[in-house]
Amino acid sequence: MRKLLNTLFVTSEDAYLSLDGENVVVNREKQVVAQYPLHILSGVISFSYAGASPALMGACAERNILLAFCTPRGKFLARTCGESQGNVLLRRTQYRSADDPLQSCRIARNFILGKVYNSRQSLERTLRDHKHRINEESMKAASESLKESLHMIAQETDMESLRGFEGSAAKIYFQVFDDMILNQKEAFFFHERSRRPPLNRINALLSFAYSLLENDCASSLEAVGLDSYVGFLHRDRPGRESLALDLMEEMRPCFADRFVLTIVNNRVIKEDDFEVRESGAVYLKDDARKVFLQQWQKKKQEVLTHPYLNEKISWGLVPYVQALLLARYLRGDLEEYPPFFWR
C-alpha cells in the first residue's frame, strides 16, 4: 500500500477493502494489515481482484472520495459514484480547457517538455554508460539539439509551433536510436518508425510497448475521473483516446523505449521470436509475447523516486500519479501540470 497525493494505492492483488467506522480497512487473508481514516483521503485506487465492501463503496460515494478498481496489471475496471457525480465538474473543466487554445497549449507544452527532456536523458544515459560502444559524436550532437529544443518549447504559446518542435525533436532522437541498440544489431535495427503495420523487429517491439503504455495511461485517467478521449495535444478523433496519448508522451522515451532497448540488449527477445506476414508486417510470436508481457510487469514493479513528489514509487504507478496531478491542476489545486522529468 502507498498513500500519495492523499490517494491510497492498494497494490496487493488479494487485498479486500472494508469499512470500520470512519476508516478504510485493508484485509489480506482475513487479517487487517492497514487502516486509514477516510477524512485524510481523496481517493482509493485498488489493483486487487478481491474487491471492496458495499459499506465502503457507499461511504466513499457519500463523501465524494474516488474509489476505483483496476486489475493487478493496471487495466481500469470501474469506479464508484454517488447520487451526484463529482467527476462531472472535473470533466466539464477538462472539456472547457480542451476547447480553449491557450489553456490547451499550456498543458500540451508541459507534456512535450517532459517527452523531449526524457528523450535527452535517455541519450545522456547511453553516453554515460556505453560511450565506447556508440558513435559518441552524433549522440552528443543529438543531445545538444534536444537541449536547445527545450528552451524554445518552454517559451512557445502556439499549438502548431509546439507540434512542430515536438516532431523535430522526435526526428533528432530517433536518428540516433540505432546507436542505443548495443547487441544483436544485425537482426534489430530501427532506421525509421513504421507503425501500421510495423515493418521490422524494433518497430514491432515499440508498437507493442506503446499499446501497453497507452492502455495503462487510459486506465489511470479513467480511474481519476478524466475523459481519456478528450486531449489537449492530440486532436479529437472518433475511437482515439487522445488524452491517453497526451499523457504517455512523456513516458515513451524513459519507460517504453528504454524497456525495448533493455530486452534487446540483454537478449531476452531474440531474432527468431518474430513472424513476418505476407504483407511485410512483423509481429512477435505468441511465446515471445508472453515473455514480453512478463518482463513488462517486472519493469512496472521496479522502484524509482518520483521527481515531483520526491517519493519512491513503482514505475507502474507513474501514469496514475501523473493523471492525479493533471486532475489536480484542472481543479485549480496546482498552478500548472508538473511533467514527469526522469532522473
What are these regions (language model features)?
Residues D14, V33-A34, Y49, A55-M57:
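Catalytic micro-motifs at enzyme active sites that drive phosphoryl/nucleotidyl and oxygen chemistry
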Residues D20, E29, S46-Y49, C70-P72:
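Acidic/polar N-terminal loop/beta-strand segments that form early-domain functional surfaces
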Residues V24-V25:
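Hydrophobic residues embedded in beta-strands of well-ordered beta-sheets
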Residues H39-A52:
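Extracellular/luminal Protease-associated
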